[in-house]
Structures are given as C-alpha cells and as structure tokens.
C-alpha cells in the first residue's frame, strides 16, 4: 500500500537525519536543512571484504560510514595494495568525487560488515541549485575535511622523506 510505503520512507528519512547529526560535515545544518539533505541520501549495507569502489573507477558520490570499518587502499609502484587510511563509524570519504568528477584515487573496501550513506553528484548538484545556502555549507564542510586530510598526509610524508636543504 502507498500509505505504508510513505510511512517507511518517512521513518527512513528520520533515521538518516539522526545519522547526519553525527557527521561534522553537517553540524552547521539544522532541522529542515537536514531533511532536505536526507532526501538526497541513499543507505547501503555491505559485507566484510566487499569493495565499495576501486581506484580508477568513476567517482560521483561521497560516503558516510554509519557502522563498521572501511579500509582505503592505494596501489604501490609494485602493484601491491597498501592501506593508507582506516575509516570507522562517523567518518566520510570520497569527498573529492563530487567536486572534480575525476576517477577514484584509491580503493575502498569493507574491513567489517558495514553500513553507510551516500550523497551522489546529481543530489549534491540539486541541493546547490535549489538550496544554495545548504550547498555552500556542505562545500565549506568538504573543504575543511580535505584541508585536514592534506595536513595529515603532508605530516605523514614529512616523516618519510629526507630534508632537501
């Protein structure tokens, strides 16, 4: 029945809003703004060992870990996969993909059974067009996350290279 479907969808949207509150990317959004974002989210569950996406795949969505642990892997020059990041509940990844439409720069694989939300490029573009203030807030949050990631990567890299001077 349509009424039951509407009730399920409404409950799922409320659940998604409750999940979004836990992510720093959305901490500046309130009430109806979170509802608008939730309308563009999709929920997924995957088993341990499952690949979410591979390095080189088309990137058009950002992921938000709700439960479980995701490994981010990068191929080395020898072709081996190296874990470059371990992402637990409350972390997001794939932020660059909704900004630049470039292929994925790494592989994401479930270390444990996991659940996550996604926001795809089309949904994000709709939010930007129809609700520019919400879109700008999300863009600022993505910029903050990417900046933090770059700082961490620079710090880790500095530990492995010799000083030039």
Language-model features: where?
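Cytosolic regulatory regions built on CNB/CRP/Popeye-like sensor folds
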Residues: 1-165
